[in-house]
Amino acid sequence: MEQYVKYPPMTERQIELMQERLFRESGPFYHLCTKPLENEIIFQNDEERKVAINLMAITAKEFNIEILAFALMSNHFHFIVRGELIDGLSFFRRLKKRLSNYFSRQGRAGVLDMVDMDPDTPMIGSLTQLRNEIAYVIRNPYVARTDVNLFAWPWCSGYLYFNPLLSSLCSKSVNELSYKEKREISRATNPELDPSFRVRNGMITLESFVNYKLVEQLFPSAQKFLWWVLKNVEAQHEVASRRGEKPNLNDDELFLTAQQLARTTFGYESVKELPFQQRKELAVILKNKWGASNSQAARIAQLDQRTVDAMFPLTAKRK
């Protein structure tokens, strides 16, 4: 069975220097994303997501880019790409056109009219930032939906990395597909699929077009990769702030953040020791910096819900 990447015995410093060099030689890298639609859902079901994955794989092969990570959200897109920005933007324009044609045939014309990439997206400037951005993308579905298994959701690349069971998943080569199956995948009259593609359950496999092996080489270990995705809360805040967003943390993550704030900001050992006024100040920090909902702020800061709702009346009904 194929195993994920392993480095020969080295010190942590040697591994980091090697990965820094790989980052410099492999770039440039960009985090391409669209703003979430406020009043529209892009993907209403798994069939639409499957079509998007297939068209994404086909389109990526047509441009001089590689996808390192991605997440299809219900109302927006995230991609970490390797290549020039102009190629990444061209890739998304072509993908958007193809998806728009598909949605039009489904009676949903115009659903992507307001979906665009920022033409001034800055290049990812360091290895640390690249790791942060990859972790942010992979984590996105997990924090947005309670039913998502971070490492088993098929509409995000999260399950590819450091997965020794990946090579045991069954798939077919495109040469084994019928003409009808190829048309169904490509949504084209004259289907042409890259021979490197593998297909599983009517969908091009993510491992066929996502360069997950490069991502593995850019993280120190599987353990550190998991830490970056699940535990590096400060990095999540940094990426969200850079994008004009607020981090989306669950209760456990907010609780740990609040405990740290109790010690570093207020000089108490725990949240439960904070006086009432300091707990209100903590709620403000959790809301404004960490994106907590009113109910989360009340639970974590140990305040009455009515107190928090009075402090933040505009979001009082958003549980």
Regions found by a protein language model. Give the residues of each.
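Short beta-strand->loop micro-motif that forms the acidic, two-metal-ion catalytic signature
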Residues: 76-83
